[in-house]
């Protein structure tokens, strides 16, 4: 069969395998490529290259494949620490996840931790693959494991009763030892992923937002703010808000320029200069955002999930405690904040991931799932994500 060229006509979805070490995440990834992509063997996926995201080195393997309905980019990480870092930094975005649980072992500590992380970082949907079912002869035992997985998902506010759970064996699929537990299960799994994991809204369809990187004044024209449009579309003549650091102000975009050409609009992905009416050069600064009125609010207090770099990763050499005051780098600027650790957490060691409360000294345009770096004097010591806003 001739290799078809990559068509951009199908919706694109980013997913990943999560779950406990040795439960079969990488074997499952290989098995999916066998039936839906260009086959990648276990060792090709397992030898994941290192990447850097927000100053943190992470090993992730990327494969792609497609079903009749969608094109998928799939990430698989070799080690548990890579999952933690990947999910917190958003190095590889996940619109949904396949949770792999060994039927022979049931849910294990990392199963729980990955579900919790998925909740904290806002992974929208999870589908479960109950792997190694060829090692379990007892149907009642399988039902017990399934029940345990559903209870665990519900505990972390996923709809445990509705989530599709597919029983199979990645190894059987790779070795063709059982069609039912192998190929059929993999095809059932991808049907479930197709139907249960929602297609993400494209950035261009979301409300307009552009982080401000720079401000210029052009004599006779007014003030220009530049940056890369993160999402949505801005049209000349539209009203926008400037949010963060200072009190929110409204203004009108009177011009949009890209590569020195005047445009009638800027859209997600474009690096633009926006000419804004009635705003002085000193009224607007890097670190604020330009956005659709009412779409984003400034906040100072939030709950976050963060990963703290190890000494070897260039992070701190010592632990920190409640009242730690680093800088939080949101989008384009650093803001000092005070950390409050949860009850029962005495201190945080380099290499830990932790839930914490943060109070910033000035408000920043913020919403759930916004990512940030934790820095000390310009050096990255951690990465985090806003899990919920307090005020």
Swiss-Prot record:
Residue intervals of the tr-type G domain: 10-201
Nucleotide-binding as UniProt keyword: yes
Source organism phylogeny: Bacteria, Pseudomonadati, Pseudomonadota, Alphaproteobacteria, Hyphomicrobiales
Top-level division of the source organism's lineage: Bacteria
Organism per entry: Brucella canis (strain ATCC 23365 / NCTC 10854 / RM-666)
CDD domains associated with the record: EF_Tu, EFTU_II, EFTU_III
NCBIfam families, per the entry: EF-Tu (TIGR00485), PRK00049.1 (NF000766), PRK12735.1 (NF009372), PRK12736.1 (NF009373), small_GTP (TIGR00231)
Ligand binding (Mg(2+)): 26
Region named G5: 169-171
Catalysed reactions listed for this entry: GTP + H2O = GDP + phosphate + H(+)
Main localization (coarse): cytoplasm
Residues the record lists as binding GTP: 19-26, 76-80, 131-134
Name the record gives this protein: Elongation factor Tu
């Amino acid at each position: 069969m001739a290799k078809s060229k990559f068509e951009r006509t199908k919706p694109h979805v980013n997913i990943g395998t999560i779950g406990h070490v040795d439960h079969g995440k990488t074997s499952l990834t290989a098995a999916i490529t066998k039936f839906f992509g260009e086959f990648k063997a276990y060792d090709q996926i397992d030898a994941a290259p290192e990447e850097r995201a927000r100053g943190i080195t992470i090993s992730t393997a990327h494969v792609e494949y497609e079903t009749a309905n969608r094109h998928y980019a799939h990430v698989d990480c070799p080690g548990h620490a890579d999952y933690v870092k990947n999910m917190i930094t958003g190095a590889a975005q996940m619109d949904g996840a396949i949770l792999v649980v060994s039927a022979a072992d049931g849910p294990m500590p990392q199963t729980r931790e990955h579900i919790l992380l998925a909740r904290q970082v806002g992974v929208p949907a999870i589908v479960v693959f109950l792997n190694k079912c060829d090692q379990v002869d007892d149907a009642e035992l399988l039902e017990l494991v399934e029940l345990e997985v559903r209870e665990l998902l519900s505990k972390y506010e996923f709809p445990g009763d509705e989530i599709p759970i597919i029983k199979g064996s990645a190894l059987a699929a790779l070795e063709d030892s059982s069609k039912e537990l192998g190929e059929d299960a993999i095809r059932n799994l991808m049907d479930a992923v197709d139907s249960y994991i929602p297609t993400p809204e494209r950035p261009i369809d979301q409300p307009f937002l552009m982080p401000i990187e720079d401000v210029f004044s052009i004599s006779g024209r007014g003030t220009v703010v530049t940056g890369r449009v993160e999402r949505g579309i801005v049209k000349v003549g539209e009203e926008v808000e400037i949010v963060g650091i200072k009190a929110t102000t409204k203004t009108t975009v009177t011009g949009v320029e890209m590569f020195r050409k005047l445009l009638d609009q800027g859209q997600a992905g474009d690096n633009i200069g926006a000419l804004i009416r009635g705003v002085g050069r000193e009224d607007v600064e890097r670190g604020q955002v330009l956005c659709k009125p009412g779409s984003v609010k400034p906040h100072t207090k939030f709950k976050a999930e963060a990963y703290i770099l190890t000494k070897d990763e260039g992070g701190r050499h010592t632990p920190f405690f409640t009242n730690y005051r680093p800088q939080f780098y949101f989008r384009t600027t650093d803001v000092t904040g005070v950390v409050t650790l949860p009850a029962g957490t005495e201190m945080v060691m380099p290499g830990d991931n932790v839930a914490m409360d943060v109070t910033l000294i000035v408000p920043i345009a913020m919403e759930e799932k916004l990512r940030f770096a934790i820095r000390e004097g310009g050096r990255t010591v951690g990465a985090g994500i806003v899990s919920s806003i307090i005020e």
